[in-house]
């Protein structure tokens, strides 16, 4: 159908990889890893499957150093951003009910982490969205 498989996984990295690898052998499809909070190793194994990996506000949290480091090294053409509203509001709004307008804080954090402009990173993630989902006509 061309519609990507959207995966939310926690504490099941091995099982998720095994399932995705097995299914990709049967038929190729696009993958989006929603609200990624997994390990660096897991991220790069997902990238080997050409997955897109989405960052939520969690990446901005003070205790998310390892996650931030992982996103710093994920190729720009494989990153998306999301709010996961109404949960996981980014710093500086952590603890509040999340909403779509708060995504700018996650984009700002990641653009600074990757040392590129907010505008450029916004363009990159928008292009990634259309690469994954198509033009949505």
Regions found by a protein language model. Give the residues of each.
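His/Asp/Glu-enriched short active-site or ligand-binding loop at hydrolase and phosphoryl-transfer sites
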Residues: 50-64
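Mid-to-C-terminal alpha-helical segments outside catalytic/metal-binding sites
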Residues: 101-137
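Non-cysteine beta-strand/loop elements that form the S-adenosyl-L-methionine
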Residues: 34, 77-85
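Active-site phosphate/pyrophosphate- and oxyanion-stabilizing loops and adjacent acidic/basic residues
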Residues: 68-69, 108
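Short, conserved catalytic or interaction motifs in soluble domains
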Residues: 76, 90, 111
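Catalytic metal-binding/acid-base residues of hydrolase active sites
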Residues: 10, 52, 86
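Divalent metal-binding pocket/active-site signature
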Residues: 1-49, 62, 69-70, 74, ...
């Amino acid at each position: 159908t061309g519609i990507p498989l959207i995966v939310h996984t926690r504490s099941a990295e091995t099982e998720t990889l095994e399932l995705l690898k097995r299914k990709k052998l049967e038929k190729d499809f696009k993958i989006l890893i929603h609200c990624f909070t997994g390990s660096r190793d897991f991220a790069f194994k997902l990238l080997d499957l050409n997955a897109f990996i989405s960052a939520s506000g969690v990446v901005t949290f003070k205790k998310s150093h390892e996650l931030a480091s992982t996103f710093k090294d994920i190729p720009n053409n494989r990153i998306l951003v999301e709010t996961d509203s109404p949960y996981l509001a980014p710093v500086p709004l952590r603890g509040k009910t999340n909403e779509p307008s708060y995504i700018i804080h996650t984009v700002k954090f990641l653009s600074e982490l990757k040392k590129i402009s907010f505008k450029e990173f916004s363009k990159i993630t928008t292009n990634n969205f259309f690469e994954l989902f198509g033009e949505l006509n």
